[in-house]
């Protein structure tokens, strides 16, 4: 519970290169652990968009269309959610960078 997807799969990009866990290793270890292999920045600059484009090019989280239902001789309008012909928004640039969820840093206010 509380494990991120990459950590659960065994891919921990911010793991320490030193495998020891003794008292001497604790003093020598830095506050921010350097990643093994490729350099992974601790910040996130983009995210996947949660909105969709419809056929007309409108952008929204959900789309509805109005349908007319006749019941007992009375016409009544109902809204039906549209699921077809929607295009995902794609990658969205964030206004200000966020800290990566897998980066092991404790934030506190002084």
Curated annotation (Swiss-Prot):
In its record, the post-translational modification comment is: Myristoylation is required for tumor suppressor activity.
| Gene Ontology annotations for the cellular component aspect, listed alphabetically | mitochondrion
GO BP, sorted A to Z = cell maturation; inflammatory response; natural killer cell differentiation; negative regulation of interleukin-17 production; neutrophil-mediated killing of gram-negative bacterium; phagocytosis; positive regulation of interleukin-10 production; regulation of mitochondrial membrane potential
| Keywords associated with the record | Cell cycle, Lipoprotein, Myristate, Phosphoprotein, Tumor suppressor
What InterPro entries does the annotation carry? FUS1
From the record, give the cysteines joined by S-S bonds.
none
Coiled coil where?
none
The keyword Lipoprotein belongs to this UniProt entry's keyword annotation? yes
- Expression (tissue specificity): Strong expression in heart, lung, skeletal muscle, kidney, and pancreas, followed by brain and liver, lowest levels in placenta.
PTM sites of type Phosphoserine: 50
Q: Does Nuclease count among this protein's keywords?
A: no
Residues carrying the lipid (N-myristoyl glycine) are 2
Q: What does this protein do?
A: May function as a tumor suppressor, inhibiting colony formation, causing G1 arrest and ultimately inducing apoptosis in homozygous 3p21.3 120-kb region-deficient cells.
Name the family.
Belongs to the TUSC2 family.
Q: Which PANTHER family match?
A: TUMOR SUPPRESSOR CANDIDATE 2
Entry protein name: Tumor suppressor candidate 2
